[in-house]
């Protein structure tokens, strides 16, 4: 309670000092395990299964925990699973982040995308920020963030938000190991040449058959969400796999992509 009171006071001082041209400020819920902010890179030119496997870049909880994708080893093939890290950013940094959220105007934005760069940049991704409060979800996106200079202060705020969260993810103290409770698994048939350097073929790792997975439209990709013991077992197997691991089911080879699901994500829905 003392921590929350101190943070609310700090936010009030920031709001008084900096103001907000939108007339409202970002707030924190009482429940510390509530997700208040997420950033992501969405879309872009990539195989469909990689687009479907995209996950939040940063996930910030009301209690100050920041979960993000950690550094990946500079090797190929790299690990199959994304590297996840969890830190605690502290009260001062939380106040700084929420001030940037105000600068972007997220508390009064429903769903807005800046596409200024689309005239000169093709096939780039959207940098997206999601802010969650008692009124719902607030989304602001910038196409090709950082590639094209713009005078829009909201775009500058987005660059500041991503940069600030990147720094906090590296410099803040650890909040313990991040453990996923649910996992999204994507599978697609894929030819494998076992003579290709690094390629390995392993037995199908899931209790469900490939045919039991949900088809994603007509994209040739199937999906399922694992929870509890199934998720734990799959993560254990996937931890020993890499980007060139393929999976055999009755003579048919598959490529599998997997990622953790956060509490506010359903999985297998697009």
Predicted region positions:
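A short, structured loop/turn motif at beta-sheet edges
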Residues: 62-63, 90-94, 131-137
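Extracytoplasmic low-complexity, Pro/Thr/Ser/Ala/Gly-rich segments
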Residues: 22-88
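C-terminal motif of bacterial Sec signal peptides marking the signal peptidase cleavage site
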Residues: 14-17
